């Protein structure tokens, strides 16, 4: 347990350093927005990058890899800023929803059911412009976007992926994965 480890750190070092461990309870200096922090923070940072070029998320096609906390809360904040997230992924593959990822459905599948993204495509149906691509049959970075936000695992973009993103017209990449 993180609280125990934090207590032992304090005992051994005789110092109170709230930033030494993540995931602590509020009593030990933890965050109220623990689940959201990385996704929100990366989205704010990426928005600031876009703004230095006179751009914003508004109306942009965005691809977010992953579907854990970082990705889900990246999707949430991008949508709040007016971007349209058209794809996200999990270890089984990626889903493309041309009308924009349905955040409520994504949260239901990943946070409540603990299901796979293939369920998203099954629920939405291919007639609605939603499709699922299994792992190994393509890369989420093949999906055309203006902003790419790797949020699944660190160092996931390869040179090949970067070249594909450039070919597809990406203007910004904001990596939230850690």
Where does each model-flagged region fall?
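N-terminal ligand-binding/catalytic initiation module
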Residues: 1-32
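Generic structural hydrophobic/aromatic packing signal, biased to beta-strands
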Residues: 2-5, 62, 88, 106, ...
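Charged/polar, solvent-exposed surface patches and flexible loops
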Residues: 4-7, 108-111, 164
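A glycine- and small-aliphatic-rich helix-loop capping segment at beta-alpha/alpha-beta transitions
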Residues: 7-12, 79-84, 169
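General beta-strand structural signal in soluble alpha/beta enzymes
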Residues: 15-21, 64, 87-90, 134, ...
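Short amphipathic alpha-helical segments, especially helix-boundary/capping motifs
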Residues: 16-24, 49, 159-165
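Glycine-rich phosphate/diphosphate-binding loop of Rossmann-like nucleotide-binding domains
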Residues: 24-25, 30-36, 40-141
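ADP-ribose/adenylate-binding Rossmann-like module
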Residues: 146-178
């Amino acid at each position: 347990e993180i609280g125990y480890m934090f207590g032992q750190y304090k005992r051994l070092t005789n110092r109170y350093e709230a930033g030494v461990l993540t995931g602590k309870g509020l009593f030990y200096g933890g965050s109220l927005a623990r689940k959201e922090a990385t996704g929100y923070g990366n989205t704010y940072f990426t928005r600031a990058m876009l703004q230095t070029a006179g751009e914003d998320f508004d109306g942009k096609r965005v691809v977010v890899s992953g579907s854990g906390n970082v990705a889900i809360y990246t999707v949430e904040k991008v949508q709040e800023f007016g971007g349209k997230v058209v794809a996200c992924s999990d270890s089984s593959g990626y889903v493309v929803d041309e009308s924009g990822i349905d955040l409520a459905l994504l949260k239901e599948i990943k946070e409540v059911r603990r299901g796979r993204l293939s369920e998203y495509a099954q629920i939405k149906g291919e007639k609605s412009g939603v499709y699922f691509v299994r792992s190994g049959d393509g890369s989420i970075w093949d999906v055309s976007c203006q902003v790419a936000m790797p949020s699944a695992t660190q160092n996931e973009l390869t040179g090949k992926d970067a070249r594909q993103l450039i070919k597809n017209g990406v203007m910004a990449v904001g990596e939230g994965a850690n």
